[in-house]
């Protein structure tokens, strides 16, 4: 082959330097496991006790309803991501198909949400380390993990993907081991600590049956329980599932990988939440699960694995590192996207030779470090108020994704869709969408109504009521911040 037939690749030494770009280094196995592990966190291993107490065995129905809602949210996001894969995902889409203000609010809201989530995860990492090394100060553990994960994210997206892959494997193995251990207790009729025979019939026969608190019921202390109240806890246990959309801009083949990962969400929820909690409540009477110890530990104890507490501690430490790793990745890409849209300082949009937005990684890590200091100095303030904003921020994100999906389809139908869709109009354009949202004419409105119902239900709980008020204030702050930045522009 002659030199004339070979296209010369531009190099940095040529007259026109090649600017660095985001690397499409995330493979199918990375995306599948990131999606798989994203829905499994400390909330499943420890927080499931709270949701079980709210609804009893009916919590399974709550997870099914909430799981369907989150599946449709990610399907909407993935419809856009497959056609127009970009870093920052829904912030970019909100800017492109809705308005620059919407992109600003969506992006900064998501970034701050993950800063707060990462803050709390790092604040508790010391508790897990102290299980084995009680003399190590908790702040030392937080600093070590903060620096280590930040360094990992600076190495390149492939390193992030590889670590998330193995973090997810550890969590998945732990859940599957619990499920099979519980099934062994049921099938082999192993004696339980409660004296009640392990059986799936316990869902319907123990302490009030399947729906012990009804849809909603008020308690003597003024608190509310029931299936509807459990939906609040359930929905926010799915936080982070939308990370699939963020990864689209760095995925090798988003048109095949993203749909596979998205369609698997419903099965992951069925296996890792509904099956896991169903087995737990078949072995342990739901009314005895009080949060003093993880129900996972109780299952392992039942099959003779008395080192379960130590094993679960390791799994939870892994889950915490995974959340911070994912959070730092998502935040750096969101800041990169905001900078490219003109909604953040320009330095956040620069990449190093590995295709990493260094400014976004370092800036996010520094802000998270400051937030961790706040947690240690004013723990009550941090957990009661800052995390309230994180809670409502997730609801804001999901509602904005669905509104953006409505706007996206209108733009596509008008002939201004991205890439191959440009120029096509009406139903012809919509039919060309590669990964369509099911029942797209009504689905976004149904999901938005459902999320608004969840926000209303939050008002019935004293702790979540703070979140609703904080969320309104937070939106006002974002609106004001956008107006200020536009006047300075």
Where do the PLM segments sit?
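Membrane-interface "cap" regions at the ends of multi-pass membrane proteins
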Residues: 1-48, 53-55, 71-75, 86-87, ...
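Helix-loop-helix connectors at the membrane interface of multi-pass transporters/channels
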Residues: 4, 15, 92-95, 101, ...
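Extracellular loop-to-transmembrane helix junctions
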Residues: 22-23, 46-141, 145, 265-268, ...
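Membrane-helix boundary/coupling elements in multi-pass transport proteins
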Residues: 86, 109-124, 233-251, 309-346, ...
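TM-loop-TM module centered on a large, flexible mid-protein loop between adjacent transmembrane helices
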Residues: 92-94, 99, 131, 205-219, ...
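C-terminal membrane-solvent junction of multi-pass transporters and transport-like membrane proteins
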Residues: 166-167, 347-358, 398-463, 488
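Hydrophobic alpha-helical segments and their helix-loop junctions in multi-pass secondary transporters
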Residues: 172-213, 279-284, 401-416, 462, ...
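A generic transmembrane alpha-helix motif of multi-pass inner-membrane proteins
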Residues: 185-186, 382-397, 437-489
């Amino acid at each position: 082959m002659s030199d004339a037939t070979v296209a010369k690749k531009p190099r940095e030494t040529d007259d026109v330097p090649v600017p660095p770009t985001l690397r499409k280094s995330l493979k199918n196995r990375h995306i599948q496991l990131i999606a798989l592990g994203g829905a499994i966190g400390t909330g499943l291993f420890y927080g499931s006790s709270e949701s079980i107490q709210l609804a009893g065995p009916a919590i399974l129905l709550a997870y099914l309803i909430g799981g369907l809602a989150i599946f449709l949210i990610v399907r909407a996001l993935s419809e856009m991501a497959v056609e127009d894969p970009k870093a920052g995902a829904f912030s970019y889409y909100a800017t492109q198909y809705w308005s620059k203000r919407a992109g600003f609010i969506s992006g900064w809201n998501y970034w701050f949400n993950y800063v707060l989530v990462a803050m709390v995860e790092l604040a508790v990492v010391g508790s897990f380390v102290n299980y084995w090394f009680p003399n190590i100060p908790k702040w030392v553990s937080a600093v070590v993990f903060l620096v280590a994960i930040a360094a990992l994210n600076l190495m390149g997206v492939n390193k992030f993907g590889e670590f998330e892959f193995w973090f997810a494997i550890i969590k998945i193995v732990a859940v599957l081991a619990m499920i099979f251990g519980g099934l062994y207790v049921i099938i082999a009729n192993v004696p339980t600590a409660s004296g009640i025979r392990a059986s799936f019939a316990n869902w319907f026969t123990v302490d009030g049956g399947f729906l012990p608190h009804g849809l909603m019921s008020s308690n003597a202390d003024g608190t509310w329980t029931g299936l509807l109240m459990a939906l609040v806890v359930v929905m926010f246990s799915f936080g982070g599932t939308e990370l699939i959309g963020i990864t689209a801009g760095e995925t090798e083949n988003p048109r095949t990988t993203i749909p596979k990962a998205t369609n698997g969400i419903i099965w992951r929820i069925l296996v890792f939440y509904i099956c896991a909690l169903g087995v737990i409540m078949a072995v342990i009477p739901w009314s005895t699960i009080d949060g003093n110890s993880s129900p996972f530990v109780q299952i392992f104890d039942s099959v003779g694995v008395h080192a379960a507490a130590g094993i679960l501690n390791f799994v939870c430490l892994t889950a915490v590192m995974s959340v911070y790793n994912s959070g730092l990745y998502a935040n750096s890409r969101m800041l990169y996207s905001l900078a490219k849209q003109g909604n953040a300082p320009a330095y956040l949009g620069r990449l190093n030779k590995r295709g990493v937005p260094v400014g976004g990684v370092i800036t996010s890590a520094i802000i998270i470090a400051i937030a961790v200091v706040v947690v240690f100095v004013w723990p009550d303030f941090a957990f009661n108020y800052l995390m309230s904003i994180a809670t409502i921020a997730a609801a804001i994100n999901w509602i904005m994704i669905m509104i953006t999906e409505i706007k996206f389809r209108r733009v596509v139908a008008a002939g201004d869709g991205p890439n191959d869709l440009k120029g096509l109009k009406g139903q012809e354009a919509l039919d060309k969408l590669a990964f369509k949202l099911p029942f797209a004419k009504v689905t976004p409105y149904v999901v938005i109504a459902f999320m608004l119902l969840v926000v209303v239900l939050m008002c019935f709980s004293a702790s979540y009521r703070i979140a609703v008020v904080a969320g309104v204030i937070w939106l006002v702050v974002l609106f004001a911040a956008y107006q200020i930045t536009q006047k300075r522009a």
